[in-house]
């Protein structure tokens, strides 16, 4: 019973740790948008960590910006003034002389209404700047507004739901309601190049943090490399052309190894009997303290089978060709591989930290390509629940695991948010570039609809891949 309780507490603690990692990554992402916006003169209405009802909120006396900590710790947003762009259309119509008809003047509802771009036409007085600033601090009635906001963060490959509540304007104190008049430009009225910088700033901050964590991890613990736990003995191939127990794989065919897919890429297309060049770290003795004495060496390994890799998950043929032992456990089996920490020199460690981040980013594009071409099924992916599950398992093992998975998630979040998928920062960049080239924006309502539909599809996809993982 005691062990059961300890295991339960350990599991809960690991899950909480995983959620905290995601929350930190999302907060850093939104802070990137925030700091870029401040430096470039944008007016910001709210910076929120989490979604749903506010647990804590405070309005800055100096800037009038609302800072909030909300109940659901699976997202966040940085709300820029005028980012829905409806004011632009209103101003344009007024300049063209469309006055007197409230249906043509394009007055916008308070942002407390869901999807203001779908508002019913009706005569309303145009809100003042102070009213607009106050309204911008009220969360949406059902979270739909936050769903298509530019600054919503999504954890790779998951999409976070936006849980809103009733308007909280009444919950603010009179002191908080008396916000000063803010300075700065509305989002859609700022220069396109400034908007692009703000849009990519979140991903940039995620990447910077991820590389920093990887550098700390690699210098403190070494890089995690693929090691042979047990090699399959054979009398058909001389021992000098075989891998041995506890060999650590460093390079294959002159290419440095970072991920298991790197081994597959280096050996793909080779036939049984081919000799491949590899650099390994091999045990050559034992130190006085009982640890292994290792030596780096270049060896030629004879492949025992053809290597024909179909996708990123198809690695069985690679391990079979290298002579890795395979042991059956019940109805399944396990290749006798292990992870080993390996320390490199100062400059190589620094270079490998950046190279590893590039490899992670490249693997994302590779997997997406395999999905689009049908070479990989969506069952190989995971949604938010899978992300939390895997993160909790790795981060809960050690501080080293915490650093590695945090760095991995940071790169994933950066790359995923820059993909040109509606509702993500990347698609906003695409729309802004098109506007820059055309010298005028696309229809703001159409753009908002595209992002809203994109969000719903992303959410549905995330739920689907999670279901496939747990069914």
Regions found by a protein language model. Give the residues of each.
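Functional transmembrane alpha-helices
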Residues: 2-7, 181-193, 233-236, 242, ...
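Small-residue-rich helix-interface/hinge motifs
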Residues: 10-121, 126-131, 137-146, 151-178, ...
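Lipid-exposed faces of alpha-helical membrane segments in multi-pass integral membrane proteins
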Residues: 16, 20, 201, 205, ...
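Internal alpha-helical transmembrane segments
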Residues: 28, 39, 76, 80, ...
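Terminal peptide-recognition signature
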Residues: 29-32, 69, 239, 246-249, ...
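Conserved PDZ fold ligand-binding element
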Residues: 239-261, 281
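PDZ-domain C-terminal substructure recognizer with occasional recognition of PDZ-binding tails
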Residues: 266-328
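Juxtamembrane boundary at the C-terminal end of a transmembrane helix
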Residues: 464-471
């Amino acid at each position: 019973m005691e062990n059961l309780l300890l295991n339960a507490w350990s599991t809960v603690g690991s899950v909480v740790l995983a959620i905290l990692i995601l929350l930190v990554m999302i907060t850093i992402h939104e802070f990137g948008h925030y700091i870029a916006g401040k430096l470039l003169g944008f007016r910001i209405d709210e910076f929120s960590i989490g979604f749903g009802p506010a647990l804590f909120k405070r309005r800055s006396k100096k800037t009038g910006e609302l800072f909030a900590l909300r109940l659901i710790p699976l997202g966040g947003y940085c709300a820029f003034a005028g980012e829905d762009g409806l004011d632009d259309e209103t101003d344009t119509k007024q300049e063209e002389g469309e006055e007197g008809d409230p249906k043509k003047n394009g007055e916008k509802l308070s942002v407390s209404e869901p999807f203001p771009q779908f508002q019913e036409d009706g005569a309303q007085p145009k809100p003042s700047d102070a009213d607009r600033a106050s309204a911008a601090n009220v969360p949406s009635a059902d979270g739909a507004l936050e769903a298509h906001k530019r600054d919503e963060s999504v954890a790779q490959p998951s999409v976070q739901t936006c849980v809103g509540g009733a308007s909280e304007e009444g919950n603010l104190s009179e002191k908080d309601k008396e916000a000063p008049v803010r300075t700065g430009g509305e989002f859609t009225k700022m220069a396109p190049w400034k908007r692009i910088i703000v849009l990519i700033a979140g991903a940039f901050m995620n990447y910077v943090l991820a590389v920093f964590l990887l550098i700390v991890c690699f210098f403190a613990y070494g890089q995690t490399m693929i090691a042979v736990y047990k090699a399959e003995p054979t009398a058909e191939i001389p021992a000098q052309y075989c891998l041995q127990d506890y060999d650590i794989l460093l390079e294959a065919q002159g290419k440095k190894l970072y991920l298991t897919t790197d081994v597959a890429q280096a050996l793909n297309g080779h036939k049984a009997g081919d000799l491949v060049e590899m650099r390994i770290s091999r045990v050559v003795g034992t130190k006085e303290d009982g640890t292994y004495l290792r030596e780096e060496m270049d060896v030629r390994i004879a492949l025992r089978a053809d290597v024909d890799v179909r996708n990123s998950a198809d690695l069985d043929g690679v391990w079979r060709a290298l002579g890795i032992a395979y042991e059956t456990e019940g109805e399944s089996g396990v290749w006798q591989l292990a992870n080993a920490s390996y320390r490199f020199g100062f400059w190589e460690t620094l270079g490998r930290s950046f190279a590893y981040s590039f490899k992670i980013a490249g693997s994302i594009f590779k997997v997406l390509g395999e999905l689009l071409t049908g070479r990989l099924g969506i069952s190989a992916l995971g949604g938010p629940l899978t992300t939390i599950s895997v993160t909790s398992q790795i981060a809960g093992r050690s501080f080293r695991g915490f650093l590695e998975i945090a760095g991995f998630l940071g790169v994933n979040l950066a790359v995923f948010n820059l993909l040109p998928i509606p509702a993500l920062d990347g698609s906003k960049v695409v729309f802004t570039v098109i506007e820059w080239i055309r010298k005028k924006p696309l229809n703001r309502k159409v753009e908002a609809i595209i992002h809203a539909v994109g969000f719903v599809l992303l959410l549905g996809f995330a739920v689907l891949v999670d279901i496939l993982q747990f069914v």
